[in-house]
Swiss-Prot record:
MF-aspect GO terms: rRNA binding; structural constituent of ribosome
Role noted for this protein: This protein binds to 23S rRNA in the presence of protein L20.
Protein name: Large ribosomal subunit protein bL21
One GO CC term, this protein: ribosome
Length: 104
């Protein structure tokens, strides 16, 4: 069984394995930079370790592959019979990270 981990980043929990590419909320790091995730909730594999709330001394190391924005989401509000309307778009920024190592 391959080793995996569950990390907390950007207010979400993400299951990761070595070599996997994940999309997370924007991290302030340039492409090619190495990032370390310290909030490891669970490390699984041959022996599963569950944190309370995090696993002590466990880290997940990854490399930032790119920064980008998701597809545009358009919101449109209007008031009937009043001629009032509002159109707004939003593109959420993200960071693509490739997982290099899980240190438990």
């Amino acid at each position: 069984m391959s080793t995996y981990a569950i990390i907390k980043t950007g207010g979400k929990q993400v299951k990761v394995e070595v070599g996997q590419a994940i999309y997370v909320e924007k991290i302030d790091a340039e492409a090619g930079a190495e990032v370390t995730f310290n909030e490891v909730v669970l490390v699984g594999g041959d022996k599963t370790v569950v944190g309370t709330p995090v696993v002590e001394g466990a880290t997940v190391v990854g490399t930032v592959e790119k920064q980008g924005k998701q597809k545009k989401v358009v919101t449109f509000k209007y008031k009937p019979k009043k001629g009032s309307h509002r159109k707004q778009g939003h593109r959420q920024p993200y960071t693509k990270v490739v997982i290099n190592a899980i240190n438990a």
